[in-house]
Amino acid sequence: MRARSTLSFAATLILATSGAVSAQQTSPTMDADGTIHAQDVVIPTSDLLSAQAKRLLIERIEHNPKFDPGPNLVERARAASLEMAQPVVKRWQEIYPATIQRVTMNGVPTDVIVPKAGIAAKNRHRVLINLHGGGFFTGGGGAAGQVESLPLAGAGRVKVVAVDYRLAPENKFPAASQDVEQVYRALLKTYKPENIGIFGCSAGGALTAQSTAWLQKQHLPRPGAIGIFCSGLMPGFWTGGDSSHVAPVLNRQLPYPAERIGEGMSGYYLSASDAKNPLAVPGISLSVLSHFPPTLLVSGTRDVALSNLLASNVALKQAGVETELLVLEGLGHGDVFLFAGAPEAKEADALIWRFFDKHLGR
């Protein structure tokens, strides 16, 4: 108890003295419900970031897409997503050259990505499945999946199958999970389930969790390991908790209004009733989670999804699942893949592959 009190006092002292640097600054105030109001707060980029990552962070923040409500919002968002992804794909191809072949598997379009350096001997009987991000309504057509797949294919010298799953609002849950199931069934004809890994970022991270639950329902063998990146598996997926309020500010955006927390599930794809369905929101059922394979969770300190992901890690551990947690200093939502070539991204890709290499069968 005394140690705890001493630590609490030390933390309070550090915070108090750090806030006394400038007498001209206004101290934060607190409402009765604990809400903090801060003025004159200055937040620099992390001094722990590489120069390249800092430059990419500033460029991303400067060019954050802004979408005014109005007609053709989905079409405009899809065009912006493609515009952002294409130069990143080009850069990853320069770092990790790969062949990309469009292949239809059980009626579902995919991109099969194979490193030009060749598949490592130990990975000849292994494969990764990528589920791209994009809020469940953008990212189709291949580029978004290639942004996430090329660095893993290159870092691990392993084949990656990027699934171009059906998008909202044209399609609703469980369309994307059904598409993943069909690709998984096709790969099971060639690969043992324990040799298959599934990963995705943002909506793709949420879909990784949904698909893992969906495969359970279909009585299919579980994959060897999964990676949930830039998303959690609790309601809201990439909203909820402190990061919903803090991360937007760190990325020069307005925080989520309190009444909108939870909309991260994307109303385009999920209905209100889906929030109570563990096939749509696996985090609400420890029973469903208990059947998950080893799971890697990846986020960054500027990622709006960080709090949900941290809560998801606790839920998975409560369910008895082996997890690893990787939180990247100074990086925001999806930057682990968007910052092509930055030391932080390459180091993270190597760690991500190390997780799959550890847990996948041979």
Please identify what each model-predicted range represents.
Residues M1-F9:
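Bacterial N-terminal signal peptides that target proteins for export
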Residues S8-S18:
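Bacterial N-terminal signal peptides
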Residues G19-A23:
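Sec/Tat signal peptide C-region and signal peptidase I cleavage site
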Residues Q24-D31, T35-H37, V42-P71, K90, ...:
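Alpha/beta-hydrolase superfamily serine-hydrolase fold, recognizing
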Residues K66-P87:
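Phosphate-/polyanion-interacting regions in eukaryotic proteins
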